[in-house]
A protein has these predicted regions:
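Membrane-interface helix-loop junctions in multi-pass transporters/channels
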Residues: 1-128
Length: 128
């Protein structure tokens, strides 16, 4: 582990976490049963991960610190499996099983689909 990689991950994670916090403040009060800030962070993070996968797959010679900054740091700080898990556990404890299913599907399937969309979009951009 290099010092530059350590700094890249830390800086990216801080910015990603700040954005996730801002999304939670802005969007979670709109529909508390399915906190939209958390969902937005995970869907946006999935899409950005797809873009990054396509970009870094194409430009393999870029410094590894760029990948660490964006993918490991920023997107790791932005997306949140732990908050999603806590929100899902809360839905289950309140016996809101329908909303639990909606939440799990939206986060898991939605994030994977957004990653695929992001990768496809970057692939189209890079083919131009």
């Amino acid at each position: 582990m290099s010092f530059s990689g350590f700094v890249a991950v830390g800086c990216g994670a801080a910015v990603g976490a700040w954005l996730r916090w801002w999304l939670a403040i802005l969007l979670n009060p709109i529909f508390p049963t399915l906190p939209l800030g958390t969902l937005t962070a995970n869907l946006l993070g999935g899409w950005l991960m797809g873009l990054a996968m396509g970009f870094f797959g194409h430009f393999e010679s870029l410094p590894p610190e760029m990948r660490l900054l964006l993918m490991t740091g920023f997107l790791g700080g932005l997306t949140t499996f732990s908050t999603f898990s806590a929100e899902t556990a809360t839905l289950i404890s309140h016996e809101q099983f329908g909303w639990t299913a909606v939440s799990v599907a939206a986060h898991v399937i939605g994030s994977v689909l957004m990653t695929l969309v992001g990768a496809a979009m970057m692939g189209m951009v890079l083919k131009r």
